[in-house]
Amino acid sequence: MNDDSETADDSLAAPTDDLAWETTDTRIDYSCPGFDIRMDDVRLPDGTETDFHYVDEPAAVVVLPFTPDGDVVVIDEWRQAVGRTNRGLPAGGTEPDDDDYAAAARRELAEETGHEAEAVEPLVTVEPANGIANSVHHYFVARGCEPSADQNLDFNESIRPTTVGYDDLKRAVLAGEVRDARTVLGVLYYELAGE
């Protein structure tokens, strides 16, 4: 047996603070509904002073919702940034007073699809773009999802819910037909976790 005290998990740990940047000031450069652009004045480890801009947004929840029959509730949503309708999982930003992400996942599922879940379980939490944003996405698997009410969309959402077979969704992800990264990550992680 190796006498080294470093374990496999230790080798994956965050690097030591000698790589850290010191934030000397921070401010919002631009604000819009949903996110801000923040600018930090920073001092790099070698002493260089510069600024760093990034997207500053609230945590988000992403839901992989299964019906009692094992189908998945997905949404078709217009995405202005890419100029097309996008198929994906229900998702949305949290509210400032949200301290229960599972409850936020239930709320987003109901608002975007009109479905309620019998059970909601955490799947994974990720930082999807931590080089340019402070985003944190909390993924949940929802089971026993059934329509219960009308959608309650935000003013800037164009969403049509539908259901697809899970195997069809997985095939579409693997074939590159689903380009929404949140959906790709959710389906692939669900598969890797052996759910």
Regions found by a protein language model. Name each.
Residues 1-21, 85, 122, 130-134, ...:
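Nudix hydrolase/Nudix homology domain
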Residues 28-33, 127-137:
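Acidic pyrophosphate-coordinating catalytic loop
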Residues 39-41, 65, 141-143, 165:
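Short, well-ordered beta-strand micro-motif
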